[in-house]
C-alpha cells in the first residue's frame, strides 16, 4: 500500500488538462481516520491546483449504510463519523456538493447494488455545480439542529417538501450527537 501510489500513477499524469468536474467516491479502507474532513479538503484543493481551476466542481459521494443490524448506536459507528466528516468537508469548501447514499446501502454488502439511483443523484449534483442548473435536485443535508423543549429539531437544506422514507412515510427517528459523539 502506497498512499500516493494511485495519485501518482493515475491522476498526476492528467494535471494541466481541462476537466469539467470531479466525483469522489471514498473507499472504506481508512474508515477510522478522525481527520478525514481536513484530508478531503486538502485533496480537493490539490486537484483544483493540478487542473488550474480554483472553482473546479467537486462532488463527494457519502458512504452508504452498511450492516443494518448492528450492536452500535448510529452515532458510535465509524461509518457515521466518516459520513459526518464528508459532510463537514463539503460544507466548508466552496463549489462542492454531497451526494447522499445513506438509504442505498445493503445489510450484507459493503457495495450498494442500486447504482442507478446513486448515478442519478451524482448527475443532479453535476447538473447543479458544473452546468448551472439551479433547479437540479440536490441531496438533503442537515442545516441546523436545536432543542425545542424536550424535542430536538433538525432542519435540512435541499429537502423540498420534507424528508420521506423508502415507503413514502415521514421518518420517525434520527440519531444525533455532538462533535464528541454525545
Where are these regions (language model features)?
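Cell-envelope and extracellular/periplasmic
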Residues: 1-182
Amino acid at each position: 500500500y502506497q498512499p500516493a501510489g494511485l495519485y501518482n500513477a493515475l491522476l498526476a499524469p492528467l494535471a494541466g488538462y481541462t476537466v469539467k468536474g470531479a466525483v469522489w467516491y471514498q473507499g472504506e479502507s481508512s474508515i477510522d481516520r478522525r481527520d478525514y474532513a481536513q484530508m478531503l479538503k486538502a485533496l480537493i484543493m490539490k486537484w483544483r491546483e493540478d487542473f488550474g481551476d480554483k472553482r473546479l466542481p467537486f462532488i463527494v459521494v457519502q458512504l452508504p449504510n452498511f450492516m443494518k443490524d448492528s450492536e452500535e448506536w448510529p452515532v458510535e459507528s465509524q461509518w457515521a463519523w466518516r459520513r459526518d466528516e464528508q459532510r463537514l468537508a463539503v460544507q466548508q469548501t466552496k463549489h462542492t456538493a454531497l451526494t447522499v447514499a445513506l438509504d442505498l446501502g445493503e445489510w450484507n454488502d459493503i457495495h450498494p447494488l442500486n447504482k442507478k439511483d446513486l448515478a442519478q443523484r451524482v448527475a443532479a449534483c453535476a447538473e447543479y455545480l458544473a452546468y448551472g442548473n439551479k433547479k437540479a435536485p440536490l441531496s438533503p443535508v442537515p442545516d441546523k439542529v436545536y432543542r425545542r423543549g424536550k424535542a430536538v429539531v433538525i432542519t435540512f437544506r435541499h429537502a423540498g417538501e420534507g424528508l420521506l422514507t423508502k415507503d413514502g412515510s415521514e421518518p420517525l427517528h434520527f440519531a444525533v450527537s455532538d462533535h464528541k459523539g454525545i
